[in-house]
Amino acid sequence: VELSIDVISDILQFSTFDSKELDKERGVILQEIGMYADEPDSIVADKFDELAYPDQPMGRSILGTSEIIKSISSDEVEGFMKGFYNPKKMVFSVSGNFEEDKIIKLVEEKFQNLPHGDDDYIPKSSYVGGEYRQEKNLEQVKLLLGFEGVDIHSDLYYATRVYSTLLGSGMSSRLFQEIREKRGLVYSIYSSGDFFSDSGIFYVYAGTGHKEVKELIPVLCDQLNINANTFTEEELTKTKAKFKVGILKGEESISTRCRSNASSYLMHNKVRSPDEFISKIDSVQLEDLEKARKKNITILVVTNGA
């Protein structure tokens, strides 16, 4: 444990950014950008974020652009690290067999040279939306329908999670059964959401063929307009059980528990127990699903073909 903390603290506090090494990594990232530019799934995802949050940090690609990567300097990388990697913005998460007092003492000793950085104000993300189409000589069409969703603090957060699972997660979901199994309009379809501290998005992804797109879109919209109260108590109970299994399985993994604790503290300023999450999921009722549907599914904002 002591060696691990020593290595992490050294990386965070005393890293050097040699220009030659930076150029090597620059080349790797440029190749990665080129690789993703050839993947329709990646194009759709990046363009969706860009349209959802234009000219905002939330809408920018994690990889960056080729222009930025080519021009960034060692000083800029070091400045970024000193500005953002500071104690005010960090959580040190430990999970497993350890002595708490010893860990606290080690962290206090080893991280004394962390830069204090700035309390930069990051404005609240503002969802906008739009439309993007890209023609490519491919057999497949990737389509993403996105909506402004709820943030992680919303009263409808848990209901939205359950609704999304019932709607489009797995082979028993409504979208899979109605659109793939019954009509054969897609080879892949699912719904999901991204939940942040100040914003959220809800979306449906579909992979299909050129000939099926025209029929797919109205059928998909019809499914999204169906009242969520048409789900049964049995379906709701099974979905809740699915969440519980996922949570309990995650608890068996030390690394998963470590990441979960860190994320929970960053988002909620406390570590939430699995029992708390399960209790919230259990409290979701059928009428809550319709509230979640109405809140998340409003207007069609993005249609991407690649």
Language model features: what each stretch is:
Residues 1-118, 133, 150-151, 181-306:
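Charge-rich, well-structured scaffold segments of protease-associated domains
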Residues 4, 166-185:
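M16/MPP (pitrilysin/insulinase) zinc-metallopeptidase core fold and M16-derived inactive scaffolds
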Residues 117-174, 303-305:
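His/Glu-based metal-binding/catalytic segments typifying zinc-dependent metallopeptidases
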